[in-house]
Design a protein with these regions (language model features):
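Canonical BTB/POZ domain core
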Residues: 1-75
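Alpha-helical protein-protein interaction/assembly modules
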Residues: 42-48, 61-160
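Residue-level recognition of tetratricopeptide repeat
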Residues: 145, 183, 215, 249, ...
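Structural motif corresponding to the intra-repeat A-B loop/turn of tetratricopeptide repeats
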Residues: 150-151, 188, 220, 250, ...
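Single-residue signature of alpha-solenoid repeat helices
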Residues: 157, 194, 226, 256, ...
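Hydrophobic/aromatic packing residues within the alpha-helices of TPR/SEL1-like helical repeat arrays
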Residues: 161, 198, 230, 260, ...
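Short coil turns that delineate tetratricopeptide repeat
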Residues: 169-172, 204-206, 235-239, 268, ...
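TPR alpha-solenoid repeat register
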Residues: 177, 209-211, 243, 273, ...
């Protein structure tokens, strides 16, 4: 009737059956036309009828209301799948966005569902716009990354990256999309397609894709061509670490060593040079030197490949306790990890190694944890906690929480969040669960919500962790200096509650910091001294600060020296000690910091400032540029811009930090190559 000439309106009985709407649905539409509200009790099938009707006859208000009502009914993945298909067919962006939100919250698990993968992999341009509007490229970037993280050779990863190429509009987007799809094609041994994609990325201006072209050339038997490609890049652009690393794969002997050393000099964060040198030393029976070499990178970058290699070294030396430590650290970072190119499950290796290691009791484990925590041995602490979690009667909530603290300290945010979620899942009580939820909220930027969870936990039962969380969140959320008194009171309440000395030491240390901020130096010193009595080694740093503020620079220096001697990971201690000595000693300490942890930016800023003071502007800028090449830190970029402005050079400066690395292993086959 509605699409005709309305002749039916003269009839006593009007046939509505051809309009795809039931009488019940039509009555709901009639009610909406009078009230502007859809009935809350309408079933799903009627809402779908109404949506189709509204779309067919351009009833925009009705369609929007129906969209929102349907969006509120999504309660399962299957609901989201069914409604997404309807939303794409009926051009309903609100409903599509709600379904998409459900899928994104369900990542990465939802990508194991073929229906979900099919929706994203087969969506055409119109459907992608309905789902994500102008954010299509970002959406497929995320989906591609998740799929590649799970299995870079999978059909899902390839399909999502093909869509990413279709979504790419700007030159930068095309560079990234072509390069990543080229990497996946290469891993799938589709060499011609990979070469074509890397060529397209290079043509779009992505210099790094030359490395992909070199890999393809080598696999096709043209090793010399690969070497020449990288040599041309090195001669044409400002040299960067990855250029020398990639070229080292296509040469031998002294040239290989020179390229690897140059790669480490330009970018000390690259894993392969350390791994190659360590493997070479191990083959030469220099086990101690090999372990020292691999420890150089593990001192500031907790990489699974390097832990794997060190595990192999210790296994060859029959040091089973150290082997077990590294295995348990690997399993903490990646519970389903498989070693030796995926052939052996890490859990299986752990069972075999454990047979050669004396079993620790629960009391032994706690003693070992105290010892390693006090020695700032974070990898060792992770291993002990993993072993404690393996016990049938373990207090898993507390242990997973401790694990998350260590992982955050090691700059591993994703495993840390997983551990926090496990802590919440295994919480022994409602008040503990609220505390762990509070930390999850705090760590994801929802400070006020985290504070409320702490308060609710305290209302159930006063506990150390609840007071500690509240103090921590309050100190961070309130810029008002007057809140210091409240934070002090909360930390004192925490210290009155039962806890172990690891956490008490942390609370005392934090309390000392608040007292320092309030200029109550004697009280701060008392807190730090008490923390040291329970072996909270980092309290040396706070005590040094108190000495310094009391104009006792020598005592501050000596206090930091004690921390350096005790801590296994002591780059930050050297950095702090540099503040309490003269310029020459400062220079030495900061050089040590850069050797131990080249990712710490303060030494570069200090050296650049000293050079600038000496009117060595070019050298100062070069010092900052050296660090920016592998760590695009905001402070370094601002400082370099200020230096350029000072010398009258108004330039827009771009680094290559942050370029995606090739998804091609440079470990197994390359490590086993012989060196002349």
């Amino acid at each position: 009737m509605l699409t005709g000439c309305f002749t039916e309106s003269f009839q006593d009985v009007i046939d509505m059956s051809e309009n795809g709407i039931s009488p019940f649905g039509m009555r709901a539409i009639c009610d909406f036309s009078q009230s502007g509200i859809l009935n809350d009790l309408l079933p799903l099938d009627i809402l779908l009828e109404i949506l189709i009707f509204a779309n067919k006859f351009c009833c925009e208000r009705l369609k929007e209301a129906c969209d929102r009502k349907l969006a509120s009914l999504i309660s399962s993945r299957q609901d989201a799948v069914d409604l997404m298909e309807c939303a794409l067919e009926e051009n309903s962006p609100v409903l599509a966005a709600s379904c998409l939100q459900f899928f994104l919250r369900d990542l990465p698990d939802c990508l194991q569902d073929e229906q979900v993968v099919r929706i994203f992999a087969t969506a055409n341009k119109r459907q992608r716009v309905i789902m994500a509007g102008n954010g299509c490229f970002s959406l497929y970037c995320l989906l591609s990354e998740v799929a590649m993280d799970s299995n870079p050779r999978s059909e899902a990863a390839a399909s999502f990256l093909e869509k990413l190429v279709e979504c790419a509009v700007s030159n930068k987007q095309k560079q990234l999309a072509f390069h990543l799809l080229g990497c996946v094609r290469l891993l799938r041994k589709e060499y011609d397609d990979a070469e074509h994609l890397f060529d397209a990325a290079v043509a779009a201006g992505h210099v790094y894709s030359v490395a992909g072209l070199a890999r393809v050339s080598c696999l096709k038997g043209h090793k010399l061509s690969s070497y020449e490609k990288l040599s041309n890049v090195i001669s044409s652009y400002a040299p960067l670490g990855w250029m020398y690393l990639e070229r080292s794969l296509y040469c031998d002997g002294d040239r290989k060593w020179e390229d690897l050393d140059k790669a480490s000099e330009l970018d000390p964060t690259l894993l392969y040079p350390y791994m190659f040198r360590a493997s070479f030393l191990m083959r030469k029976q220099s086990a101690e030197a090999a372990i020292l070499e691999i420890n150089r990178i593990l001192g500031f970058k907790l990489a699974l490949e390097c832990l794997e290699l060190r595990f192999c070294f210790y296994l060859a030396l029959e040091d089973y306790r150290a082997s077990l430590r590294d295995l348990q650290a690997i399993l903490t970072l990646s519970p389903d990890h498989r070693m030796f190119d995926g052939r052996v499950a890490c859990t299986q290796l752990r069972r075999l190694v454990k047979e050669h290691v004396e079993t620790w009791t629960t009391a032994d484990c706690w003693l070992q944890l105290y010892e390693r925590w006090s020695a700032v041995d974070d990898i060792g602490s992770l291993s002990v906690i993993y072993q404690m979690l393996d016990e049938p009667d373990a207090a898993k909530g507390i242990l997973y929480f401790r694990q998350s603290l260590l992982l955050l300290r090691l700059n591993c945010p994703r495993p840390a969040m997983r551990s926090l979620q496990l802590a919440r899942q295994h919480a022994a009580s409602e008040q503990d669960r609220l505390v762990y939820e509070g930390w999850i909220l705090y760590d994801t930027g929802h400070c006020e919500e985290g504070l409320r969870q702490a308060e609710e936990s305290i209302s159930i039962q006063r506990s150390f962790e609840a007071f500690f969380l509240k103090a921590y969140a309050l100190a961070d959320s309130s810029p008002d200096p007057s809140c210091s008194a409240t934070v002090i009171s909360l930390l004192e309440d925490a210290l009155r509650c039962p806890s172990d000395r690891l956490r008490k030491g942390q609370a005392l240390n934090n309390l000392g910091s608040v007292y320092v901020d309030c200029e109550k130096l004697d009280l701060a010193a008392d807190c730090y001294t008490s923390a040291l009595k329970v072996q909270h080694t980092r309290a040396h740093q706070g005590l040094a600060r108190v000495h310094f503020l009391k104009n006792n620079r020598k005592s501050a220096y000596e206090e930091m020296t004690k921390l350096i001697e005790k801590a296994r990971n002591n780059a930050s201690a050297y950095e702090k000690r540099s503040e309490y000595c003269d310029r020459e000693l400062t220079k030495g300490d900061l050089e040590m910091v850069t050797r131990l942890d080249p990712l710490r930016v303060y030494p570069y800023r200090y050296r650049a400032a000293v050079l600038m003071d000496g009117h060595k502007e070019k050298e100062a800028i070069a010092e900052l540029t050296r660090a920016i090449a592998f760590k695009a830190d905001l402070h370094l970029l601002h400082l370099r811009a200020a230096f350029h402005e000072h010398i009258g050079m108004w330039l827009v400066l771009f680094g290559t930090a942050g370029l995606p690395s090739l998804l091609i292993p440079t470990t197994r086959r390359c490590l086993s190559s012989k060196t002349e």
